[in-house]
């Protein structure tokens, strides 16, 4: 398992939004690049970088910041937020990203997806942004049925997805373990867990679930790390332990 710090960017700033709503910005500060370098110095093995302005407002104003972070750190960076076209995905890949996180394009025609994933299968990872059994797209402003997404993922032969619990994302309410278990029961993919992880106890719960299932690749944490609710060194030690 890995523990990956999350950096959300909106209008050139690092932010945290409750349940992905821009009306609910609960944390905001400058210098996203400084934060990325900080996590690299602290021993993070990868970064999870989301352009919320692109995801929510379809505005690429912050794209240059995302690009500069990818090029300025030596650890792998996965990027997401508004990657809804082949051109934009290919542009991010040209920066040297670890992988591009996609969700909205999963609603597109299967032939288009088959062509895209066949060319970039190791550079694209679907994000299943989960709310009440449906999958959020377009900055979590629209929702589509899970069964439709699963059918396409199965045909694309994807083996890893990110699971984000929208109802807990950015809330510090703690992880909903039953939601995660339920999601794992619906498929056989390996999963990266995000949304609501807010304490060392949450980290331990997911680590235990990983050991029981063998299918959790890692956890993605944002607000709890930024606010000191989770101690980075302690969490990393737990995750790194065999």
Curated annotation (Swiss-Prot):
Record pathway: Amino-acid biosynthesis; L-histidine biosynthesis; L-histidine from 5-phospho-alpha-D-ribose 1-diphosphate: step 4/9
Keyword Amino-acid biosynthesis: yes
Key words of the record: Amino-acid biosynthesis, Cytoplasm, Histidine biosynthesis, Isomerase
Biological process according to GO: L-histidine biosynthetic process; L-tryptophan biosynthetic process
Keyword Isomerase on entry: yes
One GO cellular component term: cytoplasm
Name of the protein in question: 1-(5-phosphoribosyl)-5-[(5-phosphoribosylamino)methylideneamino] imidazole-4-carboxamide isomerase
Organism of derivation: Dictyoglomus thermophilum (strain ATCC 35947 / DSM 3960 / H-6-12)
Lineage, top ranks: Bacteria, Pseudomonadati, Dictyoglomota, Dictyoglomia, Dictyoglomales
Gene (UniProt): hisA
């Amino acid at each position: 398992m890995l523990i990956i710090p999350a950096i959300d960017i909106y209008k050139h700033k690092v932010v945290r939004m409750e349940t992905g709503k821009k009306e609910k910005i609960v944390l905001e500060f400058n210098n996203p690049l400084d934060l990325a370098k900080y996590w690299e110095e602290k021993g993070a093995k990868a970064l999870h970088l989301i352009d919320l302005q692109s995801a929510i407002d379809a505005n690429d104003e912050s794209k240059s910041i995302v690009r500069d972070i990818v090029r300025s750190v030596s650890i792998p960076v996965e990027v997401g937020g508004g990657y809804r076209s082949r051109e934009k995905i290919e542009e991010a890949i040209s920066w040297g990203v670890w992988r591009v996180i996609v969700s909205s394009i999963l609603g597109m025609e299967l032939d288009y997806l088959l062509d895209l994933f066949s060319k970039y299968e190791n550079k694209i990872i679907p994000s299943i942004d989960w709310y009440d059994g449906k999958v959020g797209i377009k900055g979590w402003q629209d929702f589509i049925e899970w069964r439709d997404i699963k059918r396409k993922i199965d045909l694309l032969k994807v083996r890893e997805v990110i699971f984000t619990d929208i109802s807990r994302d950015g809330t510090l309410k703690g992880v909903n373990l039953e939601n995660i278990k339920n999601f794992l029961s619906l498929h056989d993919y390996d999963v990266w867990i995000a949304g609501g992880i807010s304490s060392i106890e949450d980290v331990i719960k997911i680590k235990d679930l990983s050991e029981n299932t063998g299918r959790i690749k890692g956890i993605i944490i944002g607000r709890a790390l930024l606010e000191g609710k989770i101690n980075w060194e302690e969490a990393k030690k737990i995750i790194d332990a065999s």
